[in-house]
Amino acid sequence: MANIKKGDLVQVITGRTQAKGGDRGKQGRVLSVLVERNRVVVEGVNFVTKHVRVGQTQRGSKTGGIETVEAPIHISNVALVDPESKKPTRVGFRTETVEKDGVSKTVRVRYAKKSGKDL
């Protein structure tokens, strides 16, 4: 089970400060997780400028120009935000037994180490 999943609220914990034009301290939702590259794409963080070639679409319109898109950031540079204190926290796992229809099942649950709340 992964520490950070799509849809989690994370905070950038390394990099240049916001006063110098960086992203450290910014919070955003995880848009996608690139597991094989150990990277995540965070909403509103790590913008890059892309030059897109003008090309034909199927409907005949031409698209292209300069776009700004979110680039992946390494997973070690972000921390999950505690739902209670809204500050970065580490993630822990604990096993819980859940009974459903008379059958007990063991499930791994993620929790915030600062507050102990389930994620």
Swiss-Prot record:
It comes from Clavibacter sepedonicus. One of two assembly initiator proteins, it binds directly to the 5'-end of the 23S rRNA, where it nucleates assembly of the 50S subunit. InterPro entries: Rib_uL2_dom2, Ribosomal_uL24, Ribosomal_uL24_KOW, Translation_prot_SH3-like_sf. GO terms for molecular function: rRNA binding; structural constituent of ribosome. GO terms for biological process: translation. NCBIfam families: rplX_bact. It holds the Pfam family ribosomal_L24. Keywords: Ribonucleoprotein, Ribosomal protein, RNA-binding, rRNA-binding. The keyword Signal does not apply. Belongs to the universal ribosomal protein uL24 family. The lineage of its organism: Bacteria, Bacillati, Actinomycetota, Actinomycetes, Micrococcales. It comes from the Bacteria. Part of the 50S ribosomal subunit. This is Large ribosomal subunit protein uL24.
